[in-house]
């Protein structure tokens, strides 16, 4: 891989890059990637809570997102074979997006109590096709963006991703106060259409290496390439731990808000739509700051802000129902999370080899997903036994190990470290 040039000063050409075709595609593809995630998480948790499902089981529903963790197992297949239409990336992307629309509709026509098996099966299908979409989107973005635009491109992707999440959870919860959940899920499936249109209209990225000639080359060589570099294992451990505190806290917030006394409309309006501005500002600001700071310093600064924002939930748990405090906590959490995720995504993209983009990136994001699923699956049980305030304090402290790994993975001297990471 060539050397990343993410420490360039902000220049007048930045605006031209921001509004380029590549950034628009990264944004829309991010939206398509973020929309399905909370349909099998936050929105589904709200539906289960409304149906009276036990909090422990609500926390464990996050296990249906296992496909996000194991997507590296079928990523080589998407690298090796090329559909007979649209090319290797866009062809697989179109297949995944159409299948995803159908799976979302199917999930809406299940029932958390009467058709539990159907609900779990449909949720697994949504997660599988969503994870497949993510594999192709990540590969497309890495191949489409030059190295010097990875930071800003990653922030635009996060920008769209968070907007998709907010539309699904915030919009979904507000609609659920007035419409049935099956109708809500049907409407959410229609929101996949912009991503499908983008897939049809955007060009296929130009890649010199092309598709692997054999399945052996597609499966074995990406892993040999990755694990041959210095610190490969430490990087995986870092990816597992960096956002674990933020993930644990956000994984059970919907039941927390409901138990604190907030209505679904208040949650949708304040938690989601009020947080939209902070999220979008955070993602965009994170990308622009990465051009100036570099990825390493961004990981340090944004990681500290993430941990502090998690502590805000502990304060809210102690004080109780307070719309103003909720607004402040959510604004801070969304701002810091948007910035931190932009740096995190740019970091993972920067250490992949363009010859093996889909498989290597799927491995890295799979490790990130493993952290999310394992941590989130026990959050309901932990909150039930610890109480909300102690639980959120724990989530704040558990972020420390990941931050300490930055001393090895991403030292503050970002320019030297960024160059050392390039292979």
Mark where each language-model region is:
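Juxtamembrane intracellular "pre-TM" segments in multi-pass secondary transporters
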Residues: 3-19, 204-235
